[in-house]
Amino acid sequence: MAKRHIILATVLLTAVVTARAQSEWVNPFIGTSNHGACNPGAVTPNGLMSVSPFNVMGSEMNTWDKDSRWWSTPYVAENKYFTGYSHVNLSGVGCPDAAALLTMPTRGNLQVDYHIYGCEYTEEKASPGYYSNFLANGVKTEVSATTRTSIERFTFPAGPANILLNLGEGLTNESGAMVRRVSDTEIEGFKLLGTFCYNRNAVFPIYFVLRINKAADNDGYWKKQRPMTVEAAWDSDQGAYKLYDAYTDELAGDDIGYWFSYDNLAPGEQLTIQMGVSMVSIDNARENLDKEQSGFDFDKVRQAAEDKWNEHLCKVQVEGGTDDQKTVFYTALYHTLIHPCIINDVNGQYPMMEHGSRKGKKVGVVTSGERYSVFSLWDTCRNLHQLITLLYPEKQLDMVRSIVAMYEEWGWLPRWELFGRETFTMEGDPAIPVIVDSWYKGIRSFPVETAYQGMLKSATTAGRKNKIRPDIDPYNKLGYIPLGYFQADFSGDNSVTHALEYYVADAALARMAVALGKPDDAKRFRTRSLGYKNYYDKEYGTMRPRTQDGAFLTPFNPRQGENFEPVPGFHEGSAWNYTFYVPHDIEGLIDLMGGEKDFLNKLQMVFDEDLYDPANEPDIAYPYLFSRVKNEEWRTWKTVHSLLEKHYRNAPDGIPGNDDAGTMSAWAVFSMMGFYPDCPGDPYFTLTIPAFDKVTITMGNGKKLEIVKEAAANFALQAQSQAMSRACSARIGGKKVKSYRISNKELTEAGSIVWK
């Protein structure tokens, strides 16, 4: 008996010793290749501040360069030339912006041209809230972050050294900055960011305060001078970087920076810098830094960041599966917790939505909770906000409040908001399904009537003055939008895409009207949401654009538009990528296609002939639509399993394309847990076999949901015959499911889902 106790104790001790915190499963290098647009830098959950290695400029040894093409990420795995750390970076986004305020440690003589001071690097390490590398110039670099501040520790060999702040470069399309020396260890200033996704008016300043732990032997500004010719060429600094070592007032310009130089550091001496940022003012940036960091304690900040990540990631516990699957899962969950990000300062101030000044002020104040920004709603309305609602409802409440406040400040609900500016990127009216989904899932402590008025405004305002639905007139009159109304050039006219997004939004708006006791509105918008039928062409069996005379577009190729090829009527996809995108009325689409058999055959063909695009949003829910036909759920299980294995991997290219502010990662999280929200604004989930033997979810309501996969379910996934695949079934709360599409209430109150 004693021997048995010893063995049991040894087993338990081993289990404790070998247990890994969730953050240890995260690989921040996933998504840093294959246009994933993620970066491995330090960030805290939904933090404004992020610190990323910047390796996309300065050398021909780089595979990708920010100035040679449209490039939207500060870091790419294939590149090898490091030019500093960028601050406040976007994650998984397809348009370049931010990623500025570049800090760089160098050795030897002072150089301020990044083509010269940049260098190669090795020994990269990254974990949630931490990144480090070893530079070819002999410096070890480490960075970490809080919500609004960064800390960077540089360990130097003996000899002369420099710390640079480059305000001229970054991913933003804007130029212009200012920096001011405050003391021998502190500088302050701002840089202009913006022109995101071609929107010339989406421009905003970011304010900063930078401190260093040791006064420099020499410090000063730099600015690149304009090149001169003929008589004016007498200036020896013309066309070059000019050092201002005796100038102490503030300096402004386009290509400017600040430097701290040290004559002779001791071997292993560390220089540490901190930076606080704000979208409101320099004073707020300083207050953020004072409140979020005391002293220059790098290890304390790093540990706090790691602890914060573990608090968030532990909401989901998984057992079984491979180590790679666990890494893919927790990295995906990590990526869903980067955007939207907190934009208010520690004092509650935030930049009001553009044009908010018409009410007499530009700065708002939150008195409770947080104000959020970076709402890539065309993407995230499909799954990310549903995930936040399930696991972190207090965050989703603040996000909904932020969205509604933007309507109050600006007059419209946002579509793609960035740092207090509407960028008008992508299509549709996606704030509506986000708000409606949240309401139906119990998030209601926000001004719902105000939100409803915002929904009505974009859904009913006529003409071009409708900022969210500028082509609403034909949509109202005809039930669809013909080519040539939104844009004369058919190749850039996304009429079908626009309308399909409006149908989904209108269906959600109808649900909101039902909840608020407005039956006439509910009927009106539900009817309008069925206008997609005007686009269905039986000849091709797909959605097909119509011209202004009502005829179908001719000639027409339903496959045109693959790989982002321009195509009339559709944005970033072909007709096949959009044909099934009527998730609010799949039953109606089945009838339109001639019945369940034809529907299944067409949907299966999309996957069999590689017409499905796993790297973009329009068809992201397609795998789950098989389950709308009884006894065909097995197709969902096998298709989802196959897509996860093929496109989500523990490697830099382990996301199939742009992560789109966490949307692709949210697809993986839901799919690996075993359920998915297949219709924006509709509080339902479609079940699938999970990737793990057991998933334990601690939901925001405090309840737990256990999802268990028994051996028979694995067999069903691997089975070659339909009969064997169909043999598997799920039980919810001990009862066999009648439908594999269940309500949010059923899911959150189930207690258990067991696959047998």
Q: Predicted regions span which residues?
A:
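Surface-exposed interfaces of beta-sheet-rich extracellular modules
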Residues: 721-734
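Low-complexity, intrinsically disordered or signal/transmembrane-proximal segments
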Residues: 5, 718-722
